[in-house]
Amino acid sequence: MKIFDYEDIQLIPNKCIVESRSECDTTVQFGPKAFKLPVVPANMQTVMSEELAHWFAKNDYFYIMHRFDEAARIPFIQKMQKDGLFASISVGVKANEFKFIEELADKQLVPEYITIDIAHGHSDSVIKMIKHIKKYIPKTFVIAGNVGTPEGVRELENAGADATKVGIGPGRVCITKIKTGFGTGGWQLAALNICSKAARKPIIADGGLRTHGDIAKSIRFGASMVMIGSLFAAHEESPGETVELDGKRYKEYFGSASEFQKGEHKNVEGKKMFVEHKGSLKDTLVEMQQDLQSSISYAGGKDLKSLTTVDYVIVRNSIFNGDKD
C-alpha cells in the first residue's frame, strides 16, 4: 500500500480546454441537494453556529450543525424548514440520542441530513444508530463516521449509511495520534485513497487539509465532499472569542474532544489553539471556489469529475520547500 499525505502529492496538469477558469463548474450533488462547493465546515463549536448554518443553507453551501447543544436541535430543524432551508444536524450514540431520533419521528420532523459523529465510527454503537435512524426516519440522508479503513466504510454502508466520513485524528486541533497511538494523521490522503476504493457511496474526507489545493487532491483520491476545520476557523463570522496578542487579532479554535468542549479533563483527544483572524468567511469561500476552478482548468476539464482522473507524483514533503520563509 502506498502511504502519503497531502503535502507529498502533486497533481499533473492536462491540456486546458477553457478560455477562463470562471467556466469551470465546482458544484456537487450530495444526497438530495446540490451545492456550490464540495466543501463543508467542520461541525465544531468554534466553526459552525446556527447563524452561519442559516447563511450557508441560504447560499447553497453544505453545512453540518454540531451536536453540543442538544436541546437546541429540534427548534433548529423547525426554524430551518420553516424558512424553506435544509436541516443538517449531528447526533452521538448515547442512549438519549436513540430517544431523540424517536422523538423526531413522533413530531414528524425529518432533517434532510443527519451525521452520526463520533471519533471511532467503526463500532457497533454507530451501526445500531444507522439502523435506528433508517427505521424511524428513513428519508433522512445519513452520514456516518469517522472511520479510517475500507472495512469501516463497507460495514457502515452495509448498515445503511448513505455516506461515510473518513479521518481519524488528522486535524490541527486533534491529538488522537499522540494520546492513543492510532489514527490517519500523516497518511490521511492515503487512507482516503484506500477507503474510497471500497466505497459504493459518497465519502467525506475529514481533516488534515492545510491549503485550498488539498481540496482538489481530496477529490482526486475519492472524496465527494471535504470537511474543513482550521481553514474555516477564526473568521469574522466564526463563533469563539477574539483575543489580541502583540497587536494582532486571534480567535479560539478547539477540538470536539478537548476539555474546553467537554468542560472536564476526561478522555481528552483535542486541544485549543488561537488562529490569526482571517477576515470575512464569504471572501474565503469565494477564494476557495476560484482556486478550485483553477484546479479544474489544470486538470483539463470543466467540472469536478475531471479531477478524479489526473495523474500524480509522490514528492515526499518537498512541495513546500522555500514556500514557508
Swiss-Prot record:
Its EC number is 1.7.1.7. It comes from the Bacteria. This is GMP reductase. PANTHER family: GMP REDUCTASE (PTHR43170:SF5). The gene is guaC. Gene3D superfamilies: Aldolase class I. Pfam families: IMPDH. The keyword Hydrolase does not apply. The keyword NADP applies. Belongs to the IMPDH/GMPR family. GuaC type 2 subfamily. It is an enzyme of class 1 (oxidoreductase). The active site is at 174 (thioimidate intermediate). NADP(+) binds at residues 203-226. One of its GO terms (cellular component) is GMP reductase complex. Catalyzes the irreversible NADPH-dependent deamination of GMP to IMP. It functions in the conversion of nucleobase, nucleoside and nucleotide derivatives of G to A nucleotides, and in maintaining the intracellular balance of A and G nucleotides. InterPro entries: Aldolase_TIM, GMP_reductase, GuaC_type_2, IMP_DH/GMP_Rdtase_CS, IMP_DH_GMPRt. One of its GO terms (molecular function) is GMP reductase activity. CDD domains: IMPDH (cd00381). Keywords: NADP, Oxidoreductase. NCBIfam families: GMP_reduct_2, PRK05458.1. PROSITE patterns: IMP_DH_GMP_RED (PS00487). It catalyses: IMP + NH4(+) + NADP(+) = GMP + NADPH + 2 H(+).
